[in-house]
Every structure is written in C-alpha cells, then in structure tokens.
Amino acid sequence: MSKVKGFIYKPLMVMLALLLVVVSPAGAGAAHSDASSDITLKVAIYPYVPDPARFQAAVLDQWQRQEPGVKLEFTDWDSYSADPPDDLDVFVLDSIFLSHFVDAGYLLPFGSQDIDQAEDVLPFALQGAKRNGEVYGLPQILCTNLLFYRKGDLKIGQVDNIYELYKKIGTSHSEQIPPPQNKGLLINMAGGTTKASMYLEALIDVTGQYTEYDLLPPLDPLNDKVIRGLRLLINMAGEKPSQYVPEDGDAYVRASWFAQGSGRAFIGYSESMMRMGDYAEQVRFKPISSSAGQDIPLFYSDVVSVNSKTAHPELAKKLANVMASADTVEQALRPQADGQYPQYLLPARHQVYEALMQDYPIYSELAQIVNKPSNRVFRLGPEVRTWLKDAKQVLPEALGLTDVSSLAS
C-alpha cells in the first residue's frame, strides 16, 4: 500500500507558508484523487472457476483499499475465444496462449520492479510466465489433472499412470448417465480444446521431454502411443459418458456424480472438490501420468496480464499485482457465506497455501503437489490458434469416436 509522507511545518514567513500549501502532499493527493476519479480500468477475470463472483468481489474489495478513486469495469472475455480487444486494460489468460499474445504484441512486460513479492510466487509458475526472458503475466492460479479415489480403495491408490489404472478398472461397457455406482472412470474429454490439450500433455509424458511447443507437432501422423493412451481413458469411462456435456454446461457435474457414488475413480482438477462438498474429506488424490515412464507434472497457469494498448500502464500494472496478490487470491478461495466450501483452486503463491491449510487441511496435500521440483507450466507456441483449430477436426476420428459432433471449444 502507498504511504503518504508528511513533514513538519514551521511558520517562518507568510510566503513560505503559502508555498507549503501549494506543494503539500495533501494538495498533491487531492489533485491525484481528482484525476483518478475520471479513470476507469476495464478488466476481465478468469471465468472458468467454480465461483467467479468470489474472484470479482475479492478484486474489487482489494482494489478499492488501494485506489478508491479508480473505477473498475468488469467485462466477459476469455483467451480461448478471442484475442484481447484494445480497450481491455487488464485480463487473466491461460498461459497456453501466452507465446501467441506476446509475439502478436498484445502484452506489456513486467520488470522485476513491477512484481510485488516475486519471491512468494512458485518458481516454476513465474518461469512459465516468461517469453524471451521477460515476464508477461503474474501467475494467479494453477490447474493440473489429478486422480481422485475413495480412501478405502487401496488398489487405485497404488496407481501411478493410466496403464496401471486400466488394469484396475478395465473397459466400461455402460453408456449410462450418470455412470454406475463404483464402476468405471469419470473423466471429461468432451471439448475440442480439451482433447487437443490432453494430446499435447500426453506427448510430453510419452517422449519424456518437456517443451513449450514453440514449434507445435504435426497432426499427420499423430503419435500412436499417445492416441492409444487417450483411447484407454475413453474405454474406462465409456464413450458417451466421456463426451457428455450437460445442457447447462456444468463443468463439475462429474465431481457431483463421484460424490454420489458413481465411478470407481475420477480424473479432474483440484477445484472439483468444491462440488464434492463434505464428501471431499472421504477422497484421496494424486497426480497421474499418461506414460508408463517418467512423469513430467504439467500445470495450466492462469496469469494476469496488461494490454499493451492501455492508456494507463502504471495503474494497470498495479491492478494486475492486486489481482495476483496473496490477499486477493486467498479471499477469492475462501468461503464467503454459510454453506459455501473453499474453491480448492491451486494458488500460485506460497502464502496462500500457508494461510488456507490452517483451516482446510486438504491444502496441505495440495501444497506438496505444487512444490515438486519437476513441475512445469503447460505452454503452447505462437501458432496455437491454428493448431487447435486443425486438431479439433483430426482428433475425434483418430480416437475412434463414433459421435464427432462434440467439437466444443
């Protein structure tokens, strides 16, 4: 927070007194306040979280504590659908688009002096926000696929990769929605971007080589081992359940099913536990590899970036820091009303884990997962939009899906 420096007034002469009135911090502050009152920053939070309203409320609350005279206008935008419009000052983007956004000139870099408490950010997350050696986004939240299983299921608890999981679960012969009790795998492989991202994640596991995919791989031919592994996941889930999208678009419906007894195991993000409610205490989770070899843990990283076209770069960078701060993220993740649960998203700052684990022990386990030295941010190259568009057409057929209509982005 900014501090206003005062000074001691001594009545030496009238002229000096008048001069002090003109240049006093109070006068300067008033002028700054008047100027700021005419400024509105346009901002977009990351929409694909269990409770976006908590994030918006936290950002607004923390911002008003620092810059009460600068208004915020929240707008709907996401990096999957479009490049940032010129009038969008600050926004949260998925780092799979970071290289594209940087190379296209959409983002301002952050110098070391522009990042508040950089030492608190998970090192791999900050490294994953760089392009050509410069930071172009402040890490806010992370996502990674986890294998969820019930505490008493010791055999699933011994699984480390999808091939071992298949040996325990086998092929599901049910197309039932919701799936049968304690049978099969619950997993969402419906979207076109989901399939494409899973292919590239698995390719890193299969090759054993981490890459930011500056050069994206060819779609002809596809990697046979990766396709076989993805098909195993579909077989464990059943084709229809794996491609199912509810009419209301509920991204966490499978977590609800799992809490109600469906499926023997569930692969999803940590934030799915918010939907499980109290049942989350009966569940264990762990990372799972797409390869029988060494696992390279990959994390999606949502970063707060500043538009290169903003008319207020200093204020915009200040807002970006507020949005990515430990105070804002902790407030957004905590329950804000009776009957609510933590969002169980993965924050990108150590302080948030330390605070949340005091009240929610699950965050102690999540902290262990994000602090592994082998963790990397999942990044895609500057041609990401073209590659994804092409992959959405190729992958459903390659995966042997009979209903290829589910090409949602």
From Swiss-Prot:
Result after altering residue 143 to S: Loss of activity
Keyword annotations from UniProtKB, A to Z: Secreted, Signal, Thiamine catabolism, Transferase
Lipid metabolism recorded as keyword: no
Entry-linked NCBIfam families: thiaminase_BcmE (TIGR04541)
Pfam families per UniProt: Thiaminase-1_dom
Catalytic class of the enzyme: transferase
Paired cysteines (S-S): none
Localisation: Secreted
Official protein name in the record: Thiaminase-1
Signal peptide: 1-29
Assigned EC number: 2.5.1.2
InterPro entries membership: Thiaminase-1_dom, Thiaminase_BcmE
Job of this protein: Degrades thiamine by replacing its thiazole moiety with a wide range of nucleophiles.
Description of how the protein assembles with itself and partners: Monomer.
Top-level division of the source organism's lineage: Bacteria
Primary subcellular site in the record, as a coarse category: secreted
Lineage: Bacteria, Bacillati, Bacillota, Bacilli, Bacillales
Any one biological process term the GO annotation gives: thiamine catabolic process
